[in-house]
């Protein structure tokens, strides 16, 4: 049985950790460097740092903050936001990141993602997917991103059986791209892991979108991190469970319940261990 991972997430805006609901109504949650050190000391398995406005503001990730965070942690650190090129990935790795996630740029320019995977190895590259359920009969974005010449033009567009749509720029831009198809495609480009966020569940504390998580986890052969909706350790257990109705994820990411003190990492792991999930021991 593979060890399951618990991953706190630092969504960073203007140098501060923030958290919202369905990607809006952001509120302050603290200093990223202090929180990183806190979670490392608590026994988190990894840490994710996302500069959530870098892509929409067309700027680079806040390198100096990443460097200061990396100096405080001794667990794997994944960094994303505003990553567009091989050079951007190199800067973040040099600043102390262990893994780099790409989202918007990977959809816009899949070759850039593939080039980064080839340059640094797929163990360093995470594909971040922000997905939203398609409302039956509702509007679907024209997949204008799949312009003539886009390598995924004939494979990725939403079809009659599609259930989730990919969104870019911090959840601001619908794409007309099928999330399940994109996950499989990105794995083929060289992604070593999927960071999958349900926009519908994000921040609501009602549990992960298990259908979405399970569908993508079952479709790819690389690890999947479930994100969006954790309200308690039981929700994480559901996302990590390999039972038919579980999420089949390899890791569970959470923010609100950790940032605002509802649960500690140790409390979470203790409860997950009761669900027969293999966990690395936490620090009290």
Question: Residue locations for each model-derived region?
Answer:
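Short, acidic/polar
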Residues: 28-40, 84-90, 175-185, 235-236
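Hydrophobic faces of well-ordered beta-strands that scaffold small-molecule active sites
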Residues: 4-10, 19, 47-49, 77-81, ...
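Glycine-rich, proline-tolerant flexible connector loops at the mouths of alpha/beta enzymes
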Residues: 46-64, 104, 195-206
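Conserved, mostly hydrophobic/aromatic
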Residues: 11, 39, 47, 79, ...
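Catalytic cores of alpha/beta
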Residues: 73, 77-99, 135, 211-251
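Conserved anion-binding
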Residues: 12-14, 18, 97-195, 200-201
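Alpha-helix-loop-beta-strand connector modules within alpha/beta enzyme cores
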Residues: 57-80, 115-130, 205-231, 275-277
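C-terminal helical cap(s) of enzyme catalytic domains, especially alpha/beta-barrels
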Residues: 113-120, 240-283
